[in-house]
């Protein structure tokens, strides 16, 4: 008797399982419609624009982000209308709004939106601003485990070590020769414009 019941129950369970799988797959394909795998990945991985900006997708090239770069020393990076690079504690200052443009994988150029100057670093590690973008304006962007970013010159090094964009406790740029990735003077948080 048990054998007879099992032979009737087993096919029914198999048919029901197949039916449920077909319904599930059909529902998923209808929901995704004509999306490419890249579009589906974007929808799944990025529930908000802010999450997207903290991912590494933008490092692949061509992306432009408009942000305020807030240093861990409590200063916003600023490039004024004369091209002077320094820190400001005024959040609503238009000279601290930066356009971060990806120029290659992991390499960005930083431009002051209001001043239209690019952030640059010379071979001595001094930060300055330029109207025209060149190799001095390219920085390696790295997202650290503490969720801050660092920006090291893509062209210049000092004794084999990277030279970073940094602001000291008074908002004055630190020469790249005196910076290290671990120092909070070199840690920046790209903040969305509100």
Curated annotation (Swiss-Prot):
GO CC field: cytoplasm; extracellular region; extracellular space; GABA-ergic synapse; Golgi apparatus; postsynapse
Pfam families named in the record: FGF
Glycosylation sites: 45
Descriptive protein name: Fibroblast growth factor 7
A GO molecular-function descriptor: type 2 fibroblast growth factor receptor binding
GO BP annotation list: actin cytoskeleton organization; branching involved in salivary gland morphogenesis; endothelial cell proliferation; epidermis development; fibroblast growth factor receptor signaling pathway; hair follicle morphogenesis; lung development; mesenchymal cell proliferation
Cited function: Plays an important role in the regulation of embryonic development, cell proliferation and cell differentiation. Required for normal branching morphogenesis. Growth factor active on keratinocytes. Possible major paracrine effector of normal epithelial cell proliferation.
Species this protein is from: Homo sapiens
Keywords, comma-separated and alphabetical: Glycoprotein, Growth factor, Heparin-binding, Mitogen, Secreted, Signal
Cellular compartment(s): Secreted
Signal sequence region: 1-31
UniProt tissue specificity: Epithelial cell.
Chief location bin: secreted
Subunit structure: Interacts with FGFBP1. Interacts with FGFR2. Affinity between fibroblast growth factors (FGFs) and their receptors is increased by heparan sulfate glycosaminoglycans that function as coreceptors.
InterPro entries to which the protein is assigned, alphabetical: Fibroblast_GF_fam (IPR002209), IL1/FGF (IPR008996)
Family classification: Belongs to the heparin-binding growth factors family.
SMART domains linked: FGF
């Amino acid at each position: 008797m048990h054998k007879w019941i099992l032979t009737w129950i087993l096919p029914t369970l198999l048919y029901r399982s197949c039916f449920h799988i077909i319904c599930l797959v059909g529902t998923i394909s209808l929901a995704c419609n004509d999306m490419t795998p890249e579009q589906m990945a974007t929808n799944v991985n990025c529930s908000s624009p802010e999450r997207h900006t903290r991912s590494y997708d933008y490092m692949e090239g061509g992306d432009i982000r408009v942000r305020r770069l807030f240093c861990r020393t409590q200063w916003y990076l600023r490039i004024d209308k004369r091209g002077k690079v320094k820190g400001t504690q005024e959040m609503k200052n238009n000279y601290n709004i930066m356009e971060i443009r990806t120029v290659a994988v992991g390499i960005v150029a930083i431009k002051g939106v209001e001043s239209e100057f690019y952030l640059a670093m010379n071979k001595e590690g001094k930060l300055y601003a330029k109207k025209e973008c060149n190799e001095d304006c390219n920085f390696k962007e790295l997202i650290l485990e503490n969720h801050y970013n660092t920006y090291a010159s893509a062209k210049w090094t000092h004794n084999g070590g990277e030279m970073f964009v940094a602001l000291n406790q008074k908002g004055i740029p630190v020469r790249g020769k005196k910076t290290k990735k671990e120092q909070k003077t070199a840690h920046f948080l790209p903040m969305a414009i509100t």
